[in-house]
């Protein structure tokens, strides 16, 4: 089997939901707020997992998601009976260079037209979401297209 080319740096992008809310970092928590002047949305760092052969096929591109320049990465962990989305201090390149996938930090990125979804690899069927209210922390949900928004626009920066 052919080895994938090694990547030195993650790609960068910005994310907003269908209501034009962007992700911002507030007290070590990611929240979605309406885009305004003089606001600084986070720049997302993302990089594909090098070990796709060990993951489910046809679910999307397995990626690590972090905050560019901040050594913070998104991860999923069970708190009580519920999977939760958390920010953990971690260098995204350290995750990328691990000898095996670090599933708690991986998301299946699926694209349909301009919309992207991010499904937890550790908790299949759970997706990154924002409350339709806005101004709330990002969460994980199993309920697509209901009270929470799971479709995002991902714009890659070059």
Curated annotation (Swiss-Prot):
Note the SS bond partners. none
Claim: Cytoplasm is one of the keywords in the record: yes
- Pfam families in the cross-refs: IL1 (PF00340)
Listed GO MF terms: cytokine activity; interleukin-1 receptor binding
Where, subcellularly, is it found? Cytoplasm; Secreted
* InterPro entries xrefs: IL-1_fam (IPR000975), IL1/FGF (IPR008996)
Tissue occurrence: Expressed in immune system and fetal brain, but not in other tissues tested or in multiple hematopoietic cell lines. Predominantly expressed in skin keratinocytes but not in fibroblasts, endothelial cells or melanocytes. Increased in lesional psoriasis skin.
PTM comment for this protein? N-terminal truncation leads to a dramatic enhancement of its activity (>1000-fold).
Example GO BP: cytokine-mediated signaling pathway
Listed under GO cellular component are:
cytoplasm; extracellular region; extracellular space
Q: What is its main location?
A: cytoplasm
Q: What induces it?
A: By Il-1 and TNF-alpha.
* Keyword terms, alphabetized: Cytokine, Cytoplasm, Immunity, Inflammatory response, Innate immunity, Nitration, Secreted
Q: Which residues are assigned to the propeptide feature? A: 1-5
> Other remarks on record?
Initial experiments using non-processed full-length protein found in vitro activity only in the ug range.
Task: Sum up the protein's function in the record's words.
Answer: Cytokine that binds to and signals through the IL1RL2/IL-36R receptor which in turn activates NF-kappa-B and MAPK signaling pathways in target cells linked to a pro-inflammatory response. Part of the IL-36 signaling system that is thought to be present in epithelial barriers and to take part in local inflammatory response; similar to the IL-1 system with which it shares the coreceptor IL1RAP. Seems to be involved in skin inflammatory response by acting on keratinocytes, dendritic cells and indirectly on T-cells to drive tissue infiltration, cell maturation and cell proliferation.
Q: How does it assemble?
A: Interacts with TMED10; the interaction mediates the translocation from the cytoplasm into the ERGIC (endoplasmic reticulum-Golgi intermediate compartment) and thereby secretion.
* Stated family: Belongs to the IL-1 family.
Protein name (database record): Interleukin-36 alpha
């Amino acid at each position: 089997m052919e080895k994938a080319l090694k990547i030195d740096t993650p790609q960068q992008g910005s994310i907003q939901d269908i209501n034009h809310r962007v992700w911002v970092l507030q007290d070590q928590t990611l929240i979605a707020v309406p885009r305004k002047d003089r606001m600084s949305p986070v720049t997302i760092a993302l990089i594909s997992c090098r070990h796709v052969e060990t993951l489910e096929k046809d679910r999307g591109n397995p990626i690590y998601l972090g905050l560019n320049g901040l050594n913070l990465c998104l991860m999923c962990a069970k708190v009580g009976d519920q999977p939760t989305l958390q920010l953990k201090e971690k260098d995204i390149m350290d995750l990328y260079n691990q000898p095996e996938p670090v599933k708690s930090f991986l998301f299946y990125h699926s694209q349909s037209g301009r919309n992207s979804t991010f499904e937890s690899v550790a908790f299949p069927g759970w997706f990154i979401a924002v409350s339709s209210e806005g101004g709330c922390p990002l969460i994980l949900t199993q309920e697509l297209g209901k009270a929470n928004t799971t479709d995002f626009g991902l714009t890659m920066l070059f």
